[in-house]
From Swiss-Prot:
Superkingdom of source: Bacteria
Family: Belongs to the PlsY family.
Assigned keywords, A-Z: Cell inner membrane, Cell membrane, Lipid biosynthesis, Lipid metabolism, Membrane, Phospholipid biosynthesis, Phospholipid metabolism, Transferase, Transmembrane, Transmembrane helix
Subunit details: Probably interacts with PlsX.
Catalytic activity: an acyl phosphate + sn-glycerol 3-phosphate = a 1-acyl-sn-glycero-3-phosphate + phosphate
Topology within the bilayer: Multi-pass membrane protein
Cellular component aspect of the GO annotation: plasma membrane
Function statement: Catalyzes the transfer of an acyl group from acyl-phosphate (acyl-PO(4)) to glycerol-3-phosphate (G3P) to form lysophosphatidic acid (LPA). This enzyme utilizes acyl-phosphate as fatty acyl donor, but not acyl-CoA or acyl-ACP.
Listed name of the protein: Glycerol-3-phosphate acyltransferase
Xref: InterPro entries: G3P_acylTferase_PlsY
Entry's transmembrane regions: 8-28, 57-77, 88-108, 114-134, 159-179
PANTHER family listed in its UniProt record: GLYCEROL-3-PHOSPHATE ACYLTRANSFERASE-RELATED, INNER MEMBRANE PROTEIN YGIH
Gene: plsY
Enzyme nomenclature, EC number: 2.3.1.275
Length: 200
């Protein structure tokens, strides 16, 4: 097992970032002949925008694979050296998804990757966040609202369910979710945010 030394933290930070940087939405859209996601809907590379192509399978695969990046980063780092490495790998996987080197640092909004990270880091909290996402999204039919609700719910859920050690990371991840959704928040306020399944 690798101890949580600075070199180990740096190594798993890089591994997490590179995992997070894999643009599964872009790859699937190209392989499945759906076009360039940058020219579709919001131009985002995540599952919500893939759904705007009309291909539900591609959207579901994007959701699972983007979430899987977070799961793999956290579990692999934990197996190598414990919770410190798991948290840094998870944080960097999120940053990699949002700012991937392969796409000139213009990536997705991190919702699926966030949920994957939390599920792997603290499973009960992750389940609660998934339920919060579903509640927010289906109550409003706005995907971004579900993301915001889930990110806000994460910290109190961590305290309630006995995972206080994850709180700092969850605050950082939540702040990144809000930052990446700042345009969505502005549209929610003006009532112009697209509904789930609606072309932007």
């Amino acid at each position: 097992m690798i101890e949580s030394t600075l070199p180990a933290l740096a190594l798993w930070g890089v591994i997490g970032y590179l995992l997070g940087s894999i643009p599964f939405g872009m790859v699937l859209a190209k392989v499945m002949g759906l076009g360039n996601l940058r020219d579709i809907g919001s131009g985002n590379i995540g599952a919500t925008n893939v759904l705007r192509t009309g291909n539900k399978l591609a959207a579901a695969l994007t959701l699972v694979l983007d979430g899987g990046k977070g799961v793999v980063a956290v579990l692999a780092a934990r197996a190598a050296g414990g919770e410190d490495l798991a948290q840094i790998a998870g944080l960097m996987a999120m940053i990699g998804h949002c700012y991937p080197v392969w796409l000139r640092f213009a990536g997705g909004k991190g919702v699926a990757t966030f949920l994957g990270i939390v599920l792997a880091l603290a499973f009960p909290v992750g389940v609660g966040c998934c339920l919060a996402w579903l509640a927010g999204a289906f109550a409003t039919r706005i995907s971004s609202m579900g993301a915001l609700v889930a990110s806000v719910a994460a910290v109190p859920l961590a305290f309630l369910l006995g995972f206080p050690g994850a709180v700092v990371l969850l605050i950082l991840l939540g702040a990144l979710i809000f930052w990446r959704h700042r345009g969505n928040i502005a549209r929610i306020r003006t009532g112009t945010e697209p509904k789930i399944g609606q072309k932007k």
